[in-house]
Amino acid sequence: MKEFVTFVPGINQSRTATQLKSEMLKFYDQNSFNQDYHHKEVNLDQALPSSSKANALSLDKGDVVISNSLNLATLVSEYNINKVLSLNFTKVEFNKNDLDKRYFLYLFNVYRGVQRQKERKLQGSGPILRIPIKTLEELDIPLIPIREQERIGRIYSEVLRFQGKLSRYSDLIEKFTNSILEESIKGGK
């Protein structure tokens, strides 16, 4: 994998705030990741060019971020532009155009071959197990033609988008049902 991507670890929030003496930094946190993962579609055609970044840890729309605690990856949405990665996250920088970002997401999040490799290499104790960057670099991925990668990546993104809509729809149905049930109880008194 290391021939296609570079993994950039996040930074220690407290140390950074002390060193930079700045309260203005907004950090990419678990809520940010969840917002991106249960996502709005990120249009990669409108993603900002990497040269516009203030530093390597400042995020732009379309960047790929891995949650070290969940061992899942997602695309950064416009809602999290310019946030800085904390230690809980790793940024994936693509070195070449040989690997599609959405295809990478599919491989990292779902593909059984990569899942087995990740499970064997998990480190830590307790409920949160992490994958070291060295191990991420050594993941073996199937490389197929770029057009096929793009097709698989688009399908995977559409499935995630559809799942997000279904989840929101399910929440609305539950709220609506609960509201009707409460009103029927109040009306019954």
Regions of interest found by a model, annotated:
Residues 2-16, 31-61:
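Sequence-specific dsDNA recognition surfaces
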Residues 3-8, 51-53, 65, 75, ...:
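Charge-rich amphipathic alpha-helical interaction elements
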